[in-house]
Amino acid sequence: MAVVGLGTDIAEIERVEKALSRSGEAFAQRILTDSEFEVFQQLKQKGRYLAKRFAAKEAASKALGTGIALGVTFHDFEISNDEHGKPVLSLHKKAREIADASGTKSIHLTISDERHYAVATVLLES
């Protein structure tokens, strides 16, 4: 296996919380897929969840080499958790096309947060 792409992002949780206060659920819906939004609606710490998803999707877009541009949107990335709580990244639409074209066979995602920040790293392997 060879590294196809690597991306990291950090998000300030308070900044995301302020954006949520200003824009309400519209901001969350711009970032989250439908299934992620369902989880979001049930949480007490919505800003923390959204900051972690935002950082993960930005990291994934950087690993692809596109950023959130060139036809790649936040909805092209979906984060879920396996039965042990490990984050799992799924690619859709344009992000999936680009990953397939680059020979990506394996996707690794790690997300962490503390009081002020959420950080994520994505590794794509062939």
Curated annotation (Swiss-Prot):
Its cofactor is Mg(2+). It catalyses: apo-[ACP] + CoA = holo-[ACP] + adenosine 3',5'-bisphosphate + H(+). The keyword Secreted does not apply. InterPro entries: 4-PPantetheinyl_Trfase_dom, 4-PPantetheinyl_Trfase_dom_sf, ACPS, Ppantetheine-prot_Trfase_dom. GO terms for biological process: fatty acid biosynthetic process. It is found in: Cytoplasm. Keywords: Cytoplasm, Fatty acid biosynthesis, Fatty acid metabolism, Lipid biosynthesis, Lipid metabolism, Magnesium, Metal-binding, Transferase. GO terms for molecular function: holo-[acyl-carrier-protein] synthase activity; magnesium ion binding. Its EC number is 2.7.8.7. Its main location: cytoplasm. Mg(2+) binds at D9, E58. The keyword Lipid metabolism applies. Gene3D superfamilies: 4'-phosphopantetheinyl transferase domain (3.90.470.20). GO terms for cellular component: cytoplasm. Belongs to the P-Pant transferase superfamily. AcpS family. Transfers the 4'-phosphopantetheine moiety from coenzyme A to a Ser of acyl-carrier-protein. This is Holo-[acyl-carrier-protein] synthase. It comes from Vibrio atlanticus (strain LGP32).
